Every structure is written in structure tokens, then in C-alpha cells.
Amino acid sequence: MAIVFPFQLEKKLISITSDRDQISMSIPEVSSHDSCLNDCHSVNSEEQAKPVCCLELNAHKDGIKVVDTSNDASTFSNSPLVPDNFGVVYPGIIYRSACPRASNFNFLESLHIRTIISLRQEEYSEEDLHYFTKHHINYYHIAMPGSKHRKNDCISSSSNPDISDVDDLVRKTLQLLLNKENWPVLLHCSRGKHRTGIVIGCLRALMNWPVGNRLQEYISFSHPKEREVDEEYIQNFSSDPSLKSSLNDLKRYISDSSSELADVVLSSESPTVQAATVNETCRSPGS
């Protein structure tokens, strides 16, 4: 029998149903006239809360990995509130997704997103940029080239100008993600698969995740269109001292936080987190 845990993201009530190693996250449906910031009532039926994804929580000594393992991937992406391919990198700190639409902005507001980092080539519309300004959201546009046309045999070559450019953009993005002044932050590209997957894979490398776990997470968001060139980049990513020093704030928050990050029994040998070890409250830094 499944166990239901209320999972509070600020004022947005999300119920999580656990069945062994998987959890299904349900978000109360909100009409176009309702605000995601309003207090939500308890979920009492399937009509009141439609599951939008199935998640698998994997733990490592440095954090939690949340992976969409839905049998029907469209269930998650069709939610009117949640951006496509949405994922939690570190609760209350770093999130990932495909490019959010205007219909997703209320959900992002409920997470108290302070910064949005876009890796797309395309710019947001003037209307969207005005929304960011109005709601005091920092916005960074890092036009990272896609990996679709790059050759596998040159992905690790520092002499290749395309790869050198990607290296520089990845490091700039990681610096923004690790800057606590930007938290909570949403990272996205067009579909939240490849460019976003590369950056998050490199972040996991900084946090000493095993290569296999990094690749598993990348594939879970990009399947069935995972790219060997991306996987090779994640495998071969090498850090530098400036990035290592920027990890201190993130590691400090993870170790000191009273949110679920501090309450999960973390073990790299047993990566699955049992639902009973997850604290009910996920808060933003400083809340």
C-alpha cells in the first residue's frame, strides 16, 4: 500500500505517493483565475490531484537526484503548471527544465525562482522579459551551441574551437549555478535534454558523482534521443580550481539545511532513498 507524504514547496502543496522505490508527485490543478501562490487545500481524490510524474529519488553523499521514470512521459509534460522535462537538481536551490512557457510562470513563482539561465540560441520575447523584470527575476542568456552536429572524436580536443567555446560556456553556467545569490535558480535549454543535461552532468562531476550515475541521470532526461557526444563530454569533463572553490556554498547548504537534503540517509552504495527518510518540508535558502 502506498504511503502519501505532504511535500511543501513554500506555499504550494504537492503530495507525493510512495510505492517502494518510486514516488508519484501530484499537484493540485489550478484554474486560470487561481494563483499558484495561494494556499492549497489537502488533496482528497484523484479529481483534485492529477499525478504529473513518477520520480525515482537516488541519493549520493553530496545530494539527491530526482529522475522522471513515468511510463507515460507525456503525463508530466502535459501539466499546465509544470515546464516540460522539469527536474529537481537540489531542492530549493537548483531546478532544470525545457524552456518554460508563460503558462508555467506561476509554477516557477511558487518555487520562488530568483534566477533563470537559458542555454538556447533564441531569446525570450519582450513580454516574457518584461515579466522577469516585473517579478525581480535575474535572467542570463548563454547561447550554447547544440551537440547534434559535433563529432564524437573531437569532443575532448581543446584545440577544436567549437569544443573550447562549449567548455567556456559550461564553466560560466556552472559559476552562475553555484552562486548562492542566484538561488533558487532554473536552468533550461530548448527541451531540457542535451545542453541542460551536459551542464548538470558536469555539476554532478564537481560533486563527485560516479560516472555511471551522471550518465544515468543524463539518459533519464534525454531518452530516447540521448547523444553519445554528450555522454562523452560528461565523462571527460575536467574541473578547475575556481569551480572547486565555488562549491563551498552549495556543500555548506546541503550539510546544514534542515530540509530533506539533511534528513536523507545518503549512501553511494545504496542509491535509492526510502520515502520514509524524506522530510516533509523543502524550503528555499534563507527561508
UniProtKB/Swiss-Prot annotation:
GO MF annotation terms: exopolyphosphatase activity; inorganic diphosphate phosphatase activity; inositol diphosphate tetrakisphosphate diphosphatase activity; inositol-1,5-bisdiphosphate-2,3,4,6-tetrakisphosphate 1-diphosphatase activity; inositol-1,5-bisdiphosphate-2,3,4,6-tetrakisphosphate 5-diphosphatase activity; inositol-1-diphosphate-2,3,4,5,6-pentakisphosphate diphosphatase activity; inositol-5-diphosphate-1,2,3,4,6-pentakisphosphate diphosphatase activity; phosphatase activity
PROSITE patterns membership: TYR_PHOSPHATASE_1, TYR_PHOSPHATASE_DUAL
Keyword line: Cytoplasm, Hydrolase, Nucleus, Phosphoprotein
Domain Tyrosine-protein phosphatase: 85-256
CDD domains given in the database record: PFA-DSP_unk
Residues with the Phosphoserine modification: 156, 159
Top EC group: hydrolase
Active site: 189 (phosphocysteine intermediate)
Primary localisation category: cytoplasm
Entry EC no(s): 3.6.1.52
Compartments where found: Cytoplasm; Nucleus
GO process annotations (BP): diphosphoinositol polyphosphate metabolic process
Keyword match Hydrolase: yes
Cited function: Cleaves the beta-phosphate at the 1- and 5-position of soluble inositol pyrophosphates. Has exopolyphosphatase activity in vitro but does not appear to contribute to the homeostasis of cellular polyphosphate.
PANTHER family xref list: INOSITOL PHOSPHATASE SIW14, TYROSINE-PROTEIN PHOSPHATASE
Protein name: Inositol diphosphatase siw14
Native organism: Schizosaccharomyces pombe (strain 972 / ATCC 24843)
